[in-house]
Amino acid sequence: MLEGFKKFSQHNFERDVLNQKGLTVIDFWSESCVPCRQLAKILKQLVQEVPDSVTIGSVKVEDNIELLERFNIRTTPTLLFIKDGELVETRTGVDRRQVIKKLVETYA
């Protein structure tokens, strides 16, 4: 869904998210989720505005059940903010661009 963004899965999550320094924002999305498409548009705008040290990526929930269970994700879209391997914020639903940008600035 998020072309050009890092695609995370249960196979690379540990290496590419939890073992990395800096902030990673992960969008958990589903193909059948209309609000997920709205959030994807917001994230596409934000990727141009955030520092290079921030990684924005996505996880397709249908293919990554283990990650859903690990992070207790019950709805899509869900955004996880992970800083230096630690979960610092979880957001569900579609927030305004300014809200997400402020969270990125807070944790980056």
Where does each model-flagged region fall?
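Structural cue for short, hydrophobic secondary-structure segments
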Residues: 27-29, 81
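A short beta-strand-turn-helix
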Residues: 5-23
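Short, thiol/selenol-centered motifs that function as redox-active sites or metal-ligating centers
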Residues: 32-39
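Thiol-based oxidoreductase modules, predominantly thioredoxin-like and allied folds used
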Residues: 5-8, 28, 40-47, 51-66
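Alpha/beta-hydrolase fold active-site loops
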Residues: 23-24, 77
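N-proximal helix/coil linker or "cap" segments that precede and/or mark the start of modular domains
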Residues: 1-3
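Non-catalytic, surface beta->alpha helical segment in thiol-disulfide oxidoreductase systems
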Residues: 75, 81-108
